[in-house]
Amino acid sequence: MSRIGKYPVEVPKGVTVTLNGQDLAVKGPKGELKLTLVDDVTVEQGESGLKVAPREDTQRARAMWGLSRTLVKNIVTGVTDGFTKTLEINGVGYRAAIQGKNLQLNLGFSHDVLYPIPEGIDIKCTKPTEIVITGIDKQKVGQVAAEIRGYRGPEPYKGKGVKYAGEYIFRKEGKKK
C-alpha cells in the first residue's frame, strides 16, 4: 500500500474540480491547471476530497499511485497558494534586473544573459542579488529556477554563481604551496 497515495487530497473552499475520465481540471483563486493522469490510477471525488487509487494491483499501478496523488496535490496547492523559489547570486559584479519581459543577468561573462520570462511565471528582483520566482505550476517554477541557475552554477572554491536560497555549497580548499 502506498504511504503517500492512501491519503485523500483536501480540496479547499473556492476550488472547483472537474473530472472527465483521466483528465482533471482544477480552478482556484490563482488560476486554472489541467492534468492528465495515467491509465493505471483512478480519481474519485468524495466528501474528504480527491481520492486516488490504483486500478489493479500491478507494480506499475502501485508506482503511479503515489506519484499521481502528489501531482494532484501540487495542482490543488498551486491554484490556491502558488509556489515560490528564491535564487541568490554571489560574486563581485554579479547581479540581476528585470528588463521588460526579460530577466537580465550579469554573471561575469563578456555579455549579459537575457532570459525570456515564460508565460504563467512571475519573476521579481527584490535585491540585485536575489531573484524570486513565483507561479501556480510547481514543475514550471522549478524548471525556470533550474534554467537560471544553470547559466552559472555555484563553484566550490569561492561559492560564486547562482544558487537556491538555503542551498549548501560543498567548499573545497585551494592549492597550497
From Swiss-Prot:
MF annotations from Gene Ontology: rRNA binding; structural constituent of ribosome
Cellular component annotations (GO), alphabetically ordered: cytosolic large ribosomal subunit
Any one of the GO BP annotations: cytoplasmic translation
InterPro entries associated with the record: Ribosomal_uL6-like, Ribosomal_uL6-like_a/b-dom_sf, Ribosomal_uL6_a/b-dom, Ribosomal_uL6_bac-type, Ribosomal_uL6_CS
Keywords: Ribonucleoprotein, Ribosomal protein, RNA-binding, rRNA-binding
Organism domain of life: Bacteria
Cited function: This protein binds to the 23S rRNA, and is important in its secondary structure. It is located near the subunit interface in the base of the L7/L12 stalk, and near the tRNA binding site of the peptidyltransferase center.
Assembly and oligomerization: Part of the 50S ribosomal subunit.
This protein's record includes keyword tRNA processing: no
Organism: Parvibaculum lavamentivorans (strain DS-1 / DSM 13023 / NCIMB 13966)
Keyword presence, Ribonucleoprotein: yes
Family recorded in the similarity comment: Belongs to the universal ribosomal protein uL6 family.
Name of this chain's protein: Large ribosomal subunit protein uL6
PANTHER family attached to this UniProt entry: 60S/50S RIBOSOMAL PROTEIN L6/L9, LARGE RIBOSOMAL SUBUNIT PROTEIN UL6M
